[in-house]
Amino acid sequence: MAWFKRQEKGITTATEDKMDVPKGLWYKSPTGKIIDADELARNLFVSPEDDFHVRIGSATYFEILFDNNVFVELDKNMTSKDPLHFVDTKKYAERLKDVMEKTHLKDAVRTGVGKSKGRELVICCMDFAFIGGSMGAVVGEKIARGIDHAIKNKLPFVMISKSGGARMMEAAYSLMQLAKTSVKLAQLAEAKLPYISLCTDPTTGGTTASYAMLGDINISEPGALIGFAGPRVVRDTTGKDLPEGFQTAEFLLEHGFLDFITPRKELKDKINLYIDLIQNNDIR
């Protein structure tokens, strides 16, 4: 049939005749580089051509840092109880249920205890997939308990931050976690135990205003967004153009807010090096 006689525009194909292309075969970085998904995974989710660090969750960080991915998870079934009965576009309780089913996570942080390069340590790692890695009562409590475990067992503590900040659905309960976690880190310091803080993309809001910037050594992955308010909010509030690269890890390193930028492939070696140096141990 000639195109000018067609009743419908475009090309139509019966559903049963369409080709199903599996998702995840290829990944396109923000700079336009294309990489095979399997190769990306083998490269620890770092694009080899432009060194772009793809966001990963706690499961992958634990696999990278713990020897043979062997660890014990603390408080893994702790969940929020919606004390304010908060409702926005949907009930907070329903939102929690939906995101738990989608992510298979209980909240936005997990705590693991295991060996890294042969020595035991405690790692708390945030998951951005769970309501933007927002910090609520469960996040604060799990971090506090992780620090308590480190103090009790005289272990180094590592915090991996990846968060949009405080969880608005928990209001003051969320803001209380800034003080709680900061006090616990002060207790860790009194016990003379190392605290390594790793900021990943993005680390913003209340996390930056509390535990993310309180490490004995503060490090970051390349290119991570780190700040309090986001760049757009700062620009709209001040009415001024921001410096190039504002709130990137590289900008913060240049201005003294970070100690080191560490590529993902070097994280395990570097974190353990910093711990050994702080504790005056033999370098592993």
Curated annotation (Swiss-Prot):
Segments forming domain CoA carboxyltransferase N-terminal: 24-284
Pathway in which this enzyme or protein is active: Lipid metabolism; malonyl-CoA biosynthesis; malonyl-CoA from acetyl-CoA: step 1/1
Any one GO molecular function term: carboxyl- or carbamoyltransferase activity
Keywords tagged on the record: ATP-binding, Cytoplasm, Fatty acid biosynthesis, Fatty acid metabolism, Lipid biosynthesis, Lipid metabolism, Nucleotide-binding, Transferase
Superkingdom of source: Bacteria
Residue ranges that the Swiss-Prot or TrEMBL entry lists as coiled coil: none
InterPro entries: AcCoA_carboxyl_beta (IPR034733), Acetyl_CoA_COase_Trfase_b_su (IPR000438), ClpP/crotonase-like_dom_sf (IPR029045), COA_CT_N (IPR011762)
A Pfam family assignment: Carboxyl_trans
Enzyme class: transferase
Subcellular location: Cytoplasm
GO CC annotation terms, alphabetical: acetyl-CoA carboxylase complex
Disulfide bridge partners, by residue number: none
Main localisation: cytoplasm
Complexes and interactors: Acetyl-CoA carboxylase is a heterohexamer composed of biotin carboxyl carrier protein (AccB), biotin carboxylase (AccC) and two subunits each of ACCase subunit alpha (AccA) and ACCase subunit beta (AccD).
NCBIfam families: accD
Name of the protein in its database record: Acetyl-coenzyme A carboxylase carboxyl transferase subunit beta
